[in-house]
């Protein structure tokens, strides 16, 4: 099956904390890990691993190069990803010792999609002009 996914790309910054911050608090985290994320990225990788021919379309900004690499290494076609000089989307995720999380999203280039870009992607995909 041939799948087009026009989906989000985020860098996930996961901070392990003993408890969530409260207003006015400043604390050090116990650790920091960086992951590839975004619902769109996760869906594209899962669909490719399931044996589908997947094409991912998105706008990718500064700081997100690893996201395109992760997609490509998972067998996802990344030819329709448009580069941008703006900052890519990211998530700041606090995870406490019980595994609960608190997430702050920055949309970044995920919010810069234009009608023209979407129309171009759909035309290329529909006409096999990839």
Region annotations inferred by a language model:
Residues 56, 81-83, 93-130:
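Conserved phosphate-binding/catalytic loop of the ribokinase/pfkB sugar-kinase fold
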Residues 23-90:
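Substrate-binding N-lobe of the ribokinase-like
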Residues 3, 20, 33-36, 57, ...:
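Short glycine- and Lys/Arg-enriched binding-loop motifs that mark or flank ligand-binding interfaces
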Residues 10, 75, 96:
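Conserved functional loop/turn residues at catalytic and ligand-binding sites
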Residues 10-17, 36-40, 115-118:
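Short, composition-biased local secondary-structure segments
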Residues 1-23:
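Positively charged, low-complexity intrinsically disordered leader regions
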């Amino acid at each position: 099956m041939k799948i087009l996914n026009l989906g989000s790309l985020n860098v996930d910054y996961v901070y392990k904390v003993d408890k969530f911050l409260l207003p006015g608090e400043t604390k050090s985290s116990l650790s920091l890990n960086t992951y590839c994320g975004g619902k769109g990225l996760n869906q594209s990788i899962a669909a490719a691993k399931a044996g589908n021919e997947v094409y991912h379309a998105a706008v990718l900004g500064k700081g997100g190069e690893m996201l395109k690499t992760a997609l490509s290494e998972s067998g996802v076609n990344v030819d329709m990803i448009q580069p941008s000089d703006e900052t890519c989307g990211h998530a700041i995720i606090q995870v406490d010792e019980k595994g609960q999380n608190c997430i702050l999203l920055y949309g970044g280039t995920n919010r810069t999609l234009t009608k023209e870009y979407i129309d171009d992607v759909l035309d290329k995909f529909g006409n096999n002009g990839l």
